[in-house]
Amino acid sequence: MAAAPPLSKAEYLKRYLSGADAGVDRGSESGRKRRKKRPKPGGAGGKGMRIVDDDVSWTAISTTKLEKEEEEDDGDLPVVAEFVDERPEEVKQMEAFRSSAKWKLLGGHNEDLPSNRHFRHDTPDSSPRRVRHGTPDPSPRKDRHDTPDPSPRRARHDTPDPSPLRGARHDSDTSPPRRIRHDSSDTSPPRRARHDSPDPSPPRRPQHNSSGASPRRVRHDSPDPSPPRRARHGSSDISSPRRVHNNSPDTSRRTLGSSDTQQLRRARHDSPDLAPNVTYSLPRTKSGKAPERASSKTSPHWKESGASHLSFPKNSKYEYDPDISPPRKKQAKSHFGDKKQLDSKGDCQKATDSDLSSPRHKQSPGHQDSDSDLSPPRNRPRHRSSDSDLSPPRRRQRTKSSDSDLSPPRRSQPPGKKAAHMYSGAKTGLVLTDIQREQQELKEQDQETMAFEAEFQYAETVFRDKSGRKRNLKLERLEQRRKAEKDSERDELYAQWGKGLAQSRQQQQNVEDAMKEMQKPLARYIDDEDLDRMLREQEREGDPMANFIKKNKAKENKNKKVRPRYSGPAPPPNRFNIWPGYRWDGVDRSNGFEQKRFARLASKKAVEELAYKWSVEDM
């Protein structure tokens, strides 16, 4: 077999690219064929030329080419920080649950899936049971989780459930088959659970089309901390799960078709909840028997009239009930209607600590059932109406002997007694003469007092001095005002004298001169009269005309009286700069205090100047 001619890289790439364009899916097969048909070096030994074929597989070429392209593109792309998933763990688990194919989701992919519908899973088979499609029931259904169910847990009933109200079905047996446990032979309908929480959706209506099954409702009191029990596969209880407190046969159950013609009891509303057919909690008995049946008060009177009444109770949605007022307090015929009742077995019926509902109004022993009925007494009307009377209970008139009225006692006058006093204060009835005279005297004294008060109500107050004479306040006020004025004038005069008359006059003259100068323009010229007069009157030393000026002044002031003034040598300075009298002979007769003061001021000023010069010496 002849050796295949060697291929150049360009031809090899051309063949490879044409093969890639023809079909990508056949790339692996062609690669294998090429590897099988790889040209072998011809001959053994050193004959001819040894060709080393740089055969690279198409996968390696494609990856290297893509890596090169990615490296080239990465230079143009912006740098992005690494994405860090900071979502909570619940959201991640929910996303993993939805994205995985292990679970079969029912309905829409919303987060409310666990609370939409619940199915019973009694076997390991995870396929859902048959769903009821008889009525558009979007409310949550309870499911049995006897096996480890990986589905999300159902929502509790003590949380607000926004599901709408169900309409009751009035057909005798037209509903689709119920969901029945596969390991149970119980034919009784599911019991209605009680929800004391603000759940707007009422519980499902039990269907009473089964023979010999009375409508039992299981109470779910919210104060009861015990969780609902789950029945097991091997449970001997073949009835649907109910919450009971005794294992003995329940003697309080009664079929509707029995000869007993008693009405179904109506439980009173503990709260103004108008949701139809919502049962309320009842007080438990001490003997451990728990009430198993309680009908809603909002439904009408349920009567037993034969087998035709075996259907479930009517829904108040379809029956007119005009009475939506708050619950009325029923009145008992006996004085002990509100006291605690003792049945024939001596069981004192009280509300236990776990049952926090308000106690019901107990009826008298005459209205209670037989000893076999261990359910708590219900509120009943005092007069049993006929079977045709379906009207709501009327408001009963209050009897005088009823102790059930919890309102406080009224303040009323005892019968046969009238008010002892009238509005004016006088006594009623026959009054003795002494009492009448005393009342008259008191009335006269009151009238005199009132007249005296009216007379001196606006009178002026009379003030007297120590001797008892009346004081004229107006004159006293005038005298005080005059005296104050005189004192103020004298104080001003003494203040003026204390400051000095000459100083005050000079100060006043200076103020006048300053006001006059303020009226003149800012620039004064040579032709200013005041300025020329002031310069002429000045005496200058060495002036040859000084004597002539003095003579002229003396002639001008000859007719004017001028006080003589000291004209000798300069006197020593004083604090007030006062000149001595014209008769002073020039001898200093002081103790030298003024001289010392001026010397002290001069030395202080010299020291300050020397200190300043020393501080700025180096500058």
From Swiss-Prot:
Keyword set includes Phosphoprotein: yes
GO biological process: mRNA splicing, via spliceosome; U2-type prespliceosome assembly
Subcellular location: Nucleus
Pfam families for this protein: Bud13 (PF09736)
Biased composition (Basic and acidic residues): 109-128, 139-160, 289-306, 335-353
GO cellular component term, pick one: U2-type precatalytic spliceosome
Gene Ontology MF terms in the entry: RNA binding
Positions of post-translational Phosphothreonine modification: T123, T135, T147, T159
Per UniProt, location of the Glycyl lysine isopeptide (Lys-Gly) (interchain with G-Cter in SUMO2) cross-link in this chain: K65
Compositionally biased intervals (Low complexity): 404-415
PTM annotation (Phosphotyrosine): residues: Y494
Region of interest: Disordered: 20-56, 106-429, 538-578
Biased composition (Polar residues): 246-264
Assembly: Part of the activated spliceosome B/catalytic step 1 spliceosome, one of the forms of the spliceosome which has a well-formed active site but still cannot catalyze the branching reaction and is composed of at least 52 proteins, the U2, U5 and U6 snRNAs and the pre-mRNA. Component of the minor spliceosome, which splices U12-type introns.
Name of protein: BUD13 homolog
